[in-house]
């Protein structure tokens, strides 16, 4: 997976993308790399960026991918056939385990701001979680609102950069936007509350288990990254983590509902507790994919 910056001459090969991963299974079947089963075809995908395997369950019939369906994803127009993505043994993409610092929470000293409690969690992708209120936010912010607030964007990037430096991804947090723009993903969370989505839909706090906003390449994600949801699900079962602190106590870990700018994303986690710490077996969720184009791109040398 390669992430191309839209405002810098930069391509990052760090981390993975769950939304892009959802298209790999259908492509593999379309190209004959995997034989289609009748009903559901499971495609095991090895992601070289993270050295992890993702199992994609794709609906198939008569040797072909079934794209049409009635499954809808919040923030994505239309409906399609669901693709179940299961991230197997997702912890430790950086080679340092689920908690790469060894702690459920760490305190970062942010220059010009002060101490900030964070949870740095690595499952599917490494994320740095912080409570919205710690940064003067609510968790109800929308991308159009936050992306024009230069001071908040700078603060969020500074926290992310300090986390990146702590992880050894850069030797100076000020260089993180260039040296490691994609990971860790900056994410701020809050307790469930009523809010309005980007398209004006009113969401009730009873329908979600927490509020969350993700940053991607220094801007607010319009909805929620799938790998981010996987890491959020894993973080939800870590005792004392920032995510667990704001999570609805009655939340079902097989059905965690994340309230994001586009609506609600549902995800889950399978795990075992050993010595009061979770061992993550897998995290899972649903995406869709549609065939948009078949063609030839001519690359000039």
Question: Where are the predicted features?
Answer:
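Non-transmembrane, aqueous-exposed alpha-helical and coiled segments at domain scale
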Residues: 1-301
């Amino acid at each position: 997976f390669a992430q191309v910056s839209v405002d810098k001459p930069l391509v990052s090969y760090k981390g993975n993308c769950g939304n892009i991963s959802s298209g790999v299974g259908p492509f593999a079947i379309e190209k004959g790399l995997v034989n289609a089963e009748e009903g559901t075809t499971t495609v095991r995908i090895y992601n070289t960026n993270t050295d992890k395997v993702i199992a994609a369950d794709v609906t198939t019939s008569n040797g072909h991918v079934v794209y049409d369906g009635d499954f809808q994803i919040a923030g994505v127009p239309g409906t399609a056939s669901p693709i179940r993505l299961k991230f197997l043994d997702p912890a430790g993409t950086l080679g340092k385990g689920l908690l790469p610092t060894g702690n459920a929470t760490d305190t970062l000293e942010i220059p010009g701001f002060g101490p900030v409690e964070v949870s740095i969690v690595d499952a599917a992708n490494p994320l740095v979680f912080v409570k919205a209120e710690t940064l003067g936010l609510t968790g109800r912010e929308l991308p159009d609102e936050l992306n024009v607030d230069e001071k908040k964007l700078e603060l969020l990037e500074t926290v992310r950069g300090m986390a990146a430096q702590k992880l050894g991804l850069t030797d100076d947090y000020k260089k993180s936007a260039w040296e490691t723009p994609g990971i860790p993903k900056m994410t701020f969370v809050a307790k469930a509350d009523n809010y309005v989505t980007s398209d004006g839909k009113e969401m009730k706090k009873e329908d979600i288990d927490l509020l969350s906003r993700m940053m991607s390449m220094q801007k607010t994600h319009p909805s929620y990254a799938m790998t981010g949801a996987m890491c959020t699900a894993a973080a939800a079962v870590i005792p004392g983590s920032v995510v667990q602190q704001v999570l609805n106590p009655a939340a079902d870990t097989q059905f965690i509902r994340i309230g994001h700018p586009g609506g609600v994303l549902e995800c889950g986690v399978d795990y075992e507790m050993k010595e009061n710490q979770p061992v993550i077996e897998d995290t899972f969720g649903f995406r869709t994919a549609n065939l948009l184009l078949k063609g030839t791109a001519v690359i000039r040398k």
